Amino acid sequence: NMQKLTKKTIEAIQAAQDTAIEYQNTNVDQPHLLYALMTQENGLIPQLMKKLGKDATVIAGSLERVMANIPKVTGSGRDMNTVYISQSLDRLLNASEAIAKNMGDEFVSVEHVMLSYFDNADKDIKQIFKDFAIDKDSFLKALQEVRGNQRVTTDTPEDTYDVLKKYGQDLV
């Protein structure tokens, strides 16, 4: 349900579709969306990865290798600008909506999508999480530091996270 997604989540899904088209894949799948989250300009996920001591661009590089191995579909019978959401990604997005609801949030934000990967990741992404030592508990801890007790009640919640850090001034 697109009305329940934040602007950054919609941006990430659109970027994932563009990436799938670029890689000549017929489906938008989990690696495409995680890549979009890791490379999102001014995105929350790269910020959280940094808090965890991880480099989102290096993780994105691993995802590029995964996407390069997804079968390509070319030829005259294919509409090059049409891609479909895979069943795996559809399940992940549905899980994201459930996570948002459980957290008392009104919109599905990028952190909900990221959290849904921990329980719904395909084998390639599980391996990337293992290789980079990314786990749900440390991610939740970093998220709590940035988000605090705020709830997602608008479609632009990422703008309000860590506001003191962005605009505050140390008076000491």
Model region roles, listed by residue range:
Residues N1-V172:
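Histone-fold recognition with a strong bias for associated Lys/Arg-rich disordered tails
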